[in-house]
């Protein structure tokens, strides 16, 4: 990561999670050097990208037109987060042959896992690093609040008196391969539907 580059909270959460996934994969499979030869796809799901930094910039710039660190806008879009993370993986010796961002709200990380599985099955990559990252920001909180679906109480999804959802932030990544060497689990299937009209 360039010293002049500004990292959003979404990117920082993602970098930590992808580093843990990669470290675990290397220790289980023993393929530290092999990652340079393997064709790796990086598929990352996120919705807000670097919106947290954009919000800070907007507030500073609104109050003083000369204010605000414009570098923070370099992390605004979801793709900027993925790009930063892909560069980090390359600095760790990972041979990234394909990288993309999936921004489908709550299903983004699941869609990244499905796409990575399909790419492995079609022989488009040898390893797929898949998952997602998102941080809380005013944009997300206000968006869900405007829908009037936030519950002010703790999460209770199966309770008859439930009154909405609770928002959180986090990141999680997996390393998928076609072989079972060092595998922790097996992905046996997936499903995806768009039930809107």
Q: Which residue ranges define each predicted feature?
A:
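Condensing-enzyme catalytic core mediating Claisen C-C bond formation in acyl metabolism
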Residues: 154-197
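Active-site-adjacent elements of ketosynthase-type condensing enzymes
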Residues: 52-53, 135-157, 191-197
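Short beta-strand segments
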Residues: 43-46, 103, 128-134, 176, ...
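Conserved active-site "lid/cap" helical segment
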Residues: 1-44, 50-51
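A glycine- and small-aliphatic-rich helix-loop capping segment at beta-alpha/alpha-beta transitions
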Residues: 55-67, 119-122, 142-153
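Solvent-exposed alpha-helices and their adjacent loops that cap or buttress functional pockets
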Residues: 32-36, 91-95, 120-122, 148-151, ...
């Amino acid at each position: 990561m360039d010293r002049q580059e500004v990292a959003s909270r979404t990117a920082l959460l993602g970098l930590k999670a992808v580093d843990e996934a990669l470290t675990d994969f290397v220790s289980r499979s023993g393929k530290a050097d092999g990652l340079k030869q393997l064709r790796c796809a990086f598929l990352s799901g996120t919705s807000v990208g670097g919106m947290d930094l954009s919000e800070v910039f907007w507030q500073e710039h609104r109050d003083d037109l000369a204010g605000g660190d414009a570098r923070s806008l370099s992390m605004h879009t979801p793709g900027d987060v993925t790009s930063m993370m892909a560069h980090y993986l390359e600095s760790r010796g990972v041979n990234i042959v394909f990288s993309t961002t999936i921004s489908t709200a709550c299903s983004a990380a699941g869609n990244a896992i499905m796409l990575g599985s399909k790419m492995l099955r079609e022989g488009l990559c040898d390893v797929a690093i898949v998952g997602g990252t998102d941080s809380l920001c005013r944009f997300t909180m206000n968006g869900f609040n405007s829908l009037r679906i936030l519950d002010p109480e703790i999460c209770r999804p199966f309770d008859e008196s439930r009154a909405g959802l609770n928002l959180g932030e986090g990141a999680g990544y997996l390393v998928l391969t076609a072989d079972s060497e060092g595998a922790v689990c097996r992905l046996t299937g997936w499903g995806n539907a768009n039930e809107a009209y």
